[in-house]
Amino acid sequence: MQTDPATGPLDGLVVALDIGGTKIAGALVDDEGRIRVRSQRPTPAREDDETVMGAVGDVLAELAGSPLWEAAGAVGIGSAGPVDAYRGTVSPVNVPGWRDFPLVERVHKATGGRPVTLVGDGVAMTGAEHWLGAARGHDNALCLVVSTGVGGGLVLGGRVHPGPTGNAGHIGHMVVDMDGDPCACGGRGCVERIASGPHIARRALENGWRPGPDGDVSAAAVAAAARSGDRFRPHAAVGCSRTATPGRAES
């Protein structure tokens, strides 16, 4: 567990959970967006539902060991999707053991009955960007997150728009290549299959890219190679570009 030495009022302190296919991160966050305490575990993504929930429980238990825990009044969850915010369930494509998993109910119990809000991780990220980041001051925006999967969120009319189920803007499983590779969701040619971190690296290797002396085959290494002038052509950005209309959300 990492603790920020910052001091100050604890009004508005909340428990935040970020659940993805690679890691489960948790934090106690104050009303200025500062992370006061954080915890993280690897996601046992190929294990059964209770094993994955066990990792979530470990993160929450570590946060609960902080003296700040009692001041946290609510829980916010951004989860890989799709999610169903109305029912409080999650079915992340990259965590196959969770299908209609009652995450809100389980976290509600694990946190002593605190109220829990669930949205897709892309929607949660969009809320943060609109509050404190790149979308601040913009009435309309599409924000994208590229990690183990690909997600997104929308700002419309100055407000984050999660949609009725908490998935609005989740572009990862839009089909952009009808003849593309099969996706874990059951579709073919999805954005996530083309432009997620692991698949950016995979497609770069297939198109002739070779890693440097350190052997790093991550998407970050691919991006660094592209910036340095490497002439390989993985076309990883094509999927994302096909999901957007020409021009910017705001002129």
Report each predicted region and the residues it spans:
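Nucleotide/phosphate-binding catalytic cleft detector across ATP-hydrolyzing
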Residues: 1-11, 134-140, 187
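Short glycine-rich, Thr/Ser-proximal phosphate-binding strand/loop in the N-terminal lobe
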Residues: 2-54, 89-90, 166
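Short beta-strand segments
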Residues: 18, 76-80, 119, 143-149, ...
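Generic structural signal for well-ordered alpha-helical scaffold segments
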Residues: 57-65, 127-132, 238-249
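Glycine-rich phosphate-binding loop of actin/hexokinase-like ATP-binding domains
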Residues: 138-194
